[in-house]
Amino acid sequence: MTAQYIDGKAIAAQLRAEIKAEVASLREQGIVPKLAVILVGDDPASVVYARSKEKAAANLGIAFELFTLPGDTTEAALLALIERLNADAAVHGIMVELPLPKQISKEKVLEAIHPLKDVDGVHPLNRGYLMAGQPGLVPATPMSCMELLARSGVELAGKRVVIIGRGETVGKPLFFLLLRRNATVTVCHTRTKDLAAEVRRAEIVIAAAGKAGLVTGEMIAPDAVVIDAGINEGEDGNIVGDVKTAEAAERASLISPVPGGVGACTTALLFRNVLFGLKLQGGMAHE
């Protein structure tokens, strides 16, 4: 048996179409969703990411403004800009590109963004809302995992799910998202005594450890669903996930590849957060 591959690019296209339609509807009402992105310094990867978001925003009809600050910007100056954007009713989402220069505290900066404009979903209040089952903004990568499962017709209620990785932006949020869908969830991490045994018991495996090839084919239970949220540089310089995909595909029923799986949807979901944040700011949001 060979697994069916989940087409993340096709799902991303569906998401973009849905977002584009919602943006068009908002614009007809005179509401223009807007994302502000702050870039401090000239880190090449950050510049590329910022410009790719600008292009994606234009394709969706979402207004976009990039604030480029020099690398020697003070923490106080950056916090002052964030405060100004927090107070600007025309801005519905704020994102700060990472990494930041060493003179600036990442924690202070991310916590300074208004929770309802925190499209990365990393503010402590948004984490708390997720834990409490209340409407809030959730990081894009765990949302992408959930979208791949939902749009592939995978039932979660009562299923044994193993998450590999307990990071703040993927593993932990996924735990609460899956609980919300009535899954039975185990989180494995670096101190887990027998990872292979835990994974073999899972009907759904979500790998988010950031370690290339951590999950081998022999760990996967027959007919399990495998979602690979890992992004690593392989020995040949190409991007690979946490799962040995070809091996796992021999046993799984459904598997997401890297690239072309989870990562394909994250930018679209970032912009969906802009729209959800807009609704939260207007008191219109429902879970």
Curated annotation (Swiss-Prot):
GO terms for molecular function: methenyltetrahydrofolate cyclohydrolase activity; methylenetetrahydrofolate dehydrogenase (NADP+) activity. Pathway: One-carbon metabolism; tetrahydrofolate interconversion. GO terms for biological process: L-histidine biosynthetic process; methionine biosynthetic process; purine nucleotide biosynthetic process; tetrahydrofolate interconversion. Pfam families: THF_DHG_CYH (PF00763), THF_DHG_CYH_C (PF02882). Belongs to the tetrahydrofolate dehydrogenase/cyclohydrolase family. InterPro entries: Aminoacid_DH-like_N_sf (IPR046346), NAD(P)-bd_dom_sf (IPR036291), THF_DH/CycHdrlase (IPR000672), THF_DH/CycHdrlase_cat_dom (IPR020630), THF_DH/CycHdrlase_NAD-bd_dom (IPR020631). NADP(+) binds at residues 165-167, 190, 231. Keywords: Amino-acid biosynthesis, Histidine biosynthesis, Hydrolase, Methionine biosynthesis, Multifunctional enzyme, NADP, One-carbon metabolism, Oxidoreductase, Purine biosynthesis. Homodimer. Gene3D superfamilies: Leucine Dehydrogenase, chain A, domain 1, NAD(P)-binding Rossmann-like Domain. GO terms for cellular component: cytosol. It catalyses: (6R)-5,10-methylene-5,6,7,8-tetrahydrofolate + NADP(+) = (6R)-5,10-methenyltetrahydrofolate + NADPH; (6R)-5,10-methenyltetrahydrofolate + H2O = (6R)-10-formyltetrahydrofolate + H(+). SUPFAM superfamilies: Aminoacid dehydrogenase-like, N-terminal domain (SSF53223), NAD(P)-binding Rossmann-fold domains (SSF51735). This is Bifunctional protein FolD.
